[in-house]
Amino acid sequence: MLNSEQEAISEFIIKRRIIMQVTTTVEETRKLVKNWKKEGKTVGLVPTMGFLHEGHASLIRRCREENDIVVVSDFVNPTQFGPTEDLEAYPRDFKRDSELCESLGADLIFHPEPKDMYHDPHAYVSIDTLSDTLCGKTRPIHFKGVCTVVSKLFNIVAPD
């Protein structure tokens, strides 16, 4: 049984006849966003590494409230894993993630491959104060990877 919030979102989706889209390339993502912005729509972004949970769901709902268009990135970012951290063991369930995003009214999931996000292995964003504090003390490349991917996502989606 749906709660009232889920019913409201479902009704909203039906009224707008939304079909959530999935893109895997930077080019197709930029093209969609450009078209939405030409129509005068506001675009919000919820960056994730997938394997979504209620915390992500609350961010998607908030983004839905504040924007005409909701883009969710679902990208396991290899640059924020150190050599002793197991990137391959990071949980992934794209089918589950996409079903959740669609149920929450997301308009687009951007699901790129690492080669599309990191075609230039020499360009990074690094904030030294982050790398030296918090978990940066024990995971020295973590924040460089996070800052880089978030910068790239902001550049690709250009959220309002």
Predicted regions and their residues:
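Nucleotidyltransferase catalytic core that binds NTPs
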Residues: 21-160
